[in-house]
Amino acid sequence: MESSASTGAGDVPKGMQVCVVTETFSPEVNGVAMTLGHLIMGLLKRKHLVTLIRPRQHAYDRPGCCTKPNVVLVPGLPVPGYKTIRFGLPMRRKLQKIWNINRPDVIYVATQGPLGWAAVVEATRGNIPVISGFHTNFHRYAQHYHVT
């Protein structure tokens, strides 16, 4: 993994390649999407290269917050009771192919759905550092959306 630290006088630090995997993102309006929008904007501002992997959300092909991340759309299915959001399918082979071609320095998994699970499995298999955040208590929401 390349360091983002400067190697000498006058050198410009090299940004990291960061991959963000999520089930939801702008222009959807929810806490996870808004938080990730700020995270990605901050990473881009600091000259990191960002790849965003998310399910296609009907007509939404580009994130509403920014145009700089490389966006990879994957198939998804509607969340029962929450038809405006689609969860990503566990696209393990596609993730493996993407990361073999352009290996990220780190992967951030923002949601723990099937796509997020597949990302953790493939990152671990590929020896790529992976981190995750807890944004939503889906176990609690599952009762509300009648999927338990």
Where are these regions (language model features)?
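A short, charged, and often flexible helix/loop element on the N-terminal side
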Residues: P69-K97, H146-T148
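N-terminal subdomain of nucleotide-sugar transferases
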Residues: M1-P75
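A conditional alpha-helix N-cap/helix-loop micro-motif detector
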Residues: V32, F87-L89, Q112
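Short, well-ordered alpha-helical microsegments
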Residues: A59-Y60, L115-A118
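Active-site proximal beta-strand in glycosyltransferases
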Residues: V18, V106, V121-Y141
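Short N-terminal targeting/anchoring amphipathic segment
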Residues: L95-G116, G126-P129, G133
